[in-house]
Amino acid sequence: TNGNTVQWVNGYPSEALLRQDVARGDLYVMEEDGVVYGVFAFIIGDDPTYQTIHGAWRDNDTPYGTLHRLGSDGTRRGVLAEAVDWALTRLPHLRADTHEANVTMQRCLGRAGFVRCGVIRIADGTPRLAYERI
């Protein structure tokens, strides 16, 4: 949770949520020589929390994939860039969101070609900065 001291609290992401990601085939691990150094969910299709945005998405007409729950063990740099590169082989239109306090993730998203589009609210009602790459 480097740079992410307030976004992942109170047991988030829960074991149940991660199990759902696995069951749907949406959870991916990044490993080298059998050692996991990163994890993320990649979900293709409409994200209900992205339906309402204070701002505007750049493209509402083409299918997109969303990167969620990206985490690393802190031993490598470029974990987000690696996840984005992989996701782009599946779909060229990507979205992501992060907490306003997670400046590290905001910078990484910008470097990975994402543009900040506005603010969305996640299921519990808290705001997140919304990003899109097309």
Model-derived segments and spans:
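Conserved GNAT-fold acetyl-CoA-binding loop/helix
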Residues: 1-17
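Short loop/turn motifs at secondary-structure junctions and domain boundaries
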Residues: 19-24
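Conserved beta-strand in the GNAT
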Residues: 29, 35-45
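Conserved acyl-donor/pantetheine-binding loop and adjacent beta-alpha core of acyl/acetyltransferases
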Residues: 41-75
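Conserved GNAT acetyl-CoA-binding A-motif
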Residues: 89-101
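Conserved active-site alpha-helix within GNAT-family acetyltransferase domains
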Residues: 100-118, 126
